[in-house]
């Protein structure tokens, strides 16, 4: 009898506990709560302290300032002291306007609101937010504005936005879809760092510079459209973007920073334009890179070192790839000088293609390469000249080929491949190891070294 009473008491307690939990969940306000503000800074007067942590869906109409924003952050589970009990997940500010004034909304001596600016740290560390509509008048996204907003899966920025601050979306790894307005001209460094949920992105035509770390570790990114006006790609800009498989850089790009594409292990094809300056280890760890197209207008040593203090003396060509993985290299006729140790320790080099009618001085350019095991491809009728020349004559095999008719290296993304040939003029049905000659629909012809 006593045992039955204890069991009954236990079941009663379980029932009361479950009921309390259910009641707590039911206590959340899930319907949309719409609040119209007649004056900025009055949101705290509209929402009592007993309700602010229960509202999950909020729409605000009217002007809002720092005082209002401080409460919004509190309701979205973050304040100056860390995590709060806020449950705000859906926020509609489509009919709101951000204005200057009010209290600091982030730290007591930190950020204040400015007219039509989504300020620094506006939603930083608010993981509860899953759906957000910004005021239509916003023109700028501040630094760290959405940092660590892990709950956001998609976001459309207002059409008037022209600037995105540094680290603005850092660690928003839940973000899978993002539309950037056409008027955006500036994106801060580390802006999308660790957004590995993003799969595709189109950069607006006005963006001329991709700054350091902008897309660092966006491993889910498989499709990227770069604007034609792009001129510079910063340090580690795409480092760790292992999902990228092919990339054509706009012809206007003149500089690629150090480690810019390091760790892009999925990259298999790359097109570089002439006159480009490439930083050290820019393609380090690109183990899948098999096809590289480029042309050089300076002598090789000057070209590779131009504008950089980071010089890899072991193998300058590492600025294109990891030197130990290079099996073939095409040296354009525009190269007039081979600098000392230009290919030093490229131990896997198997083929070198040149097009000079008369051998130029090679000096110590191939020191440590082991050219006795390499094949040298030279213009027709010049095999004897190269055989008798210093350095060139030490190549294990010298083969003549016809390099004529090679017009230019194209970087156009519109041109389509029409046909592909070997250096002997044989039609190829697919890329073949060594030098391929490819004709395109725009009339251009490209030499492509396939490893």
Language-model features, listed with the residues they occupy:
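Consensus positions within tandem repeat domains that build extended binding/scaffold surfaces
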Residues: 119-122, 142-147, 165-170, 188-193, ...
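Short, T/G/N/S-enriched strand-turn elements that build extracellular solenoid repeat scaffolds
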Residues: 41-51, 67-77, 281-282, 340-344, ...
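Short, surface-exposed loop/turn motifs with a glycine/proline- and acidic-biased composition
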Residues: 422-442
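C-terminal tail/sorting-segment detector
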Residues: 4-6, 437-451
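Sec/Tat signal peptide C-region and signal peptidase I cleavage site
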Residues: 20-25
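Bacterial N-terminal signal peptides
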Residues: 10-19
